[in-house]
Amino acid sequence: MNVVQGNIEAKNAKVAIVISRFNSFLVESLLEGALDTLKRFGQVSDENITVVRVPGAVELPLAARRVAASGKFDGIIALGAVIRGGTPHFDFVAGECNKGLAQIALEFDLPVAFGVLTTDTIEQAIERSGTKAGNKGGEAALSLLEMVNVLQQLEQQL
């Protein structure tokens, strides 16, 4: 039986982090978590990490698509925070952001890790950006590292 599964070390991986500025006090913590994970666990060097800042979560897919189209990266991490308010705006932003990022992964055959918080309250967002519910930026980086390795193995074996 042949089993393909990734590990989290990817020393030579070139990673782009596309991050929204909206809710910056939260997303900066997500960025710290992602960078720490990439460097400490993935052994990814600073020169192999590019950070792209965009205004908000709606702009993440377009920037990620441009990064993917460049062909210079092994994977993309998308970071942001969308918090439900009193209008349906949350549903549109969260849904379109998620759908757009998933489409890029499939279109370019490139791992795109979803580190965009979609929460009902500010408290939930704070919990997921480095306090008692962990750091979703770090978790997105772990997922990306593993998928970079899985895809490399599949390319070699198939």
Swiss-Prot record:
<comment type="subunit">
    <text>Forms an icosahedral capsid composed of 60 subunits, arranged as a dodecamer of pentamers.</text>
</comment>
<protein>
    <recommendedName>
        <fullName>6,7-dimethyl-8-ribityllumazine synthase</fullName>
        <ecNumber>2.5.1.78</ecNumber>
    </recommendedName>
</protein>
<keyword id="KW-0686">Riboflavin biosynthesis</keyword>
<dbReference type="GO" id="GO:0009231">
    <property type="term" value="P:riboflavin biosynthetic process"/>
</dbReference>
<dbReference type="GO" id="GO:0005737">
    <property type="term" value="C:cytoplasm"/>
</dbReference>
<feature type="binding site">
    <location>
        <position position="114"/>
    </location>
    <ligand>
        <name>5-amino-6-(D-ribitylamino)uracil</name>
    </ligand>
</feature>
<comment type="similarity">
    <text>Belongs to the DMRL synthase family.</text>
</comment>
<feature type="active site" description="Proton donor">
    <location>
        <position position="89"/>
    </location>
</feature>
<keyword id="KW-0808">Transferase</keyword>
<comment type="function">
    <text>Catalyzes the formation of 6,7-dimethyl-8-ribityllumazine by condensation of 5-amino-6-(D-ribitylamino)uracil with 3,4-dihydroxy-2-butanone 4-phosphate. This is the penultimate step in the biosynthesis of riboflavin.</text>
</comment>
<dbReference type="InterPro" id="IPR036467">
    <property type="entry name" value="LS/RS_sf"/>
</dbReference>
<feature type="binding site">
    <location>
        <position position="128"/>
    </location>
    <ligand>
        <name>(2S)-2-hydroxy-3-oxobutyl phosphate</name>
    </ligand>
</feature>
<dbReference type="InterPro" id="IPR002180">
    <property type="entry name" value="LS/RS"/>
</dbReference>
<feature type="binding site">
    <location>
        <begin position="86"/>
        <end position="87"/>
    </location>
    <ligand>
        <name>(2S)-2-hydroxy-3-oxobutyl phosphate</name>
    </ligand>
</feature>
<dbReference type="GO" id="GO:0000906">
    <property type="term" value="F:6,7-dimethyl-8-ribityllumazine synthase activity"/>
</dbReference>
<feature type="binding site">
    <location>
        <begin position="81"/>
        <end position="83"/>
    </location>
    <ligand>
        <name>5-amino-6-(D-ribitylamino)uracil</name>
    </ligand>
</feature>
<dbReference type="InterPro" id="IPR034964">
    <property type="entry name" value="LS"/>
</dbReference>
<feature type="binding site">
    <location>
        <begin position="57"/>
        <end position="59"/>
    </location>
    <ligand>
        <name>5-amino-6-(D-ribitylamino)uracil</name>
    </ligand>
</feature>
<dbReference type="GO" id="GO:0009349">
    <property type="term" value="C:riboflavin synthase complex"/>
</dbReference>
<feature type="binding site">
    <location>
        <position position="22"/>
    </location>
    <ligand>
        <name>5-amino-6-(D-ribitylamino)uracil</name>
    </ligand>
</feature>
<comment type="pathway">
    <text>Cofactor biosynthesis; riboflavin biosynthesis; riboflavin from 2-hydroxy-3-oxobutyl phosphate and 5-amino-6-(D-ribitylamino)uracil: step 1/2.</text>
</comment>
<dbReference type="Pfam" id="PF00885">
    <property type="entry name" value="DMRL_synthase"/>
</dbReference>
<dbReference type="GO" id="GO:0005829">
    <property type="term" value="C:cytosol"/>
</dbReference>
